[in-house]
Amino acid sequence: MNSTHHYEQLIEIFNSCFADEFNTRLIKGDDEPIYLPADAEVPYNRIVFAHGFYASAIHEISHWCIAGKARRDLVDFGYWYCPDGRDAQTQSQFEDVEVKPQALDWLFCVAAGYPFNVSCDNLEGDFEPDRVVFQRRVHAQVMDYLANGIPERPARFIKACLLYTSD
């Protein structure tokens, strides 16, 4: 089993799975993560993850796996994002939309042999999110995926991670 984790591995795995069929590439960025659809300057879609962080790459892949065709034509999938420093209500909304991506993160991390940690992503907020409650919600979604089936794109990525880590 491959016990070291480098972002280049995820780029190789993702691009081998999806670059041709979905015209999408995983790219290391130097700033905040963002999804950029193909345009006049770059002929392919880009999932740009933050600063070469392995966990960021996993998480951005999760968002891409959830986004439908129409959303994949929009910058950052057209998603709403409120930065760190959220109040209780906004944090609750943030966690609602993060359950499914973080459940995929968990599955991807297990397949890659990488430790998973939920992220409430609110270090500067005016209250402390209940990380345990959020983790239970994410875990429940993981169990739902396992019981009822993992969608095709995430299942393909999981299989590729498992094959890579078994070498």
Question: Where would I find each of the regions flagged by the language model?
Answer:
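Auxiliary, metal-adjacent structural segments of Zn-dependent hydrolase domains
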Residues: 1-40, 91-96
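Short pre-active-site segment immediately N-terminal to the catalytic Zn-binding motif
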Residues: 42-55
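Short helix/loop segments within enzyme catalytic domains
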Residues: 108-122
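Conserved small/polar residues in nucleotide/adenosyl-binding loops
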Residues: 164-167
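Helix-rich interaction surfaces within compact, conserved domain-sized segments
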Residues: 140-157
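Post-HEXXH active-site segment of zinc metalloproteases
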Residues: 68-98
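Active-site recognition of the HExxH zinc-binding catalytic motif
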Residues: 55-68
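An active-site-proximal "capping" alpha-helix that borders the catalytic cofactor pocket
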Residues: 96-110
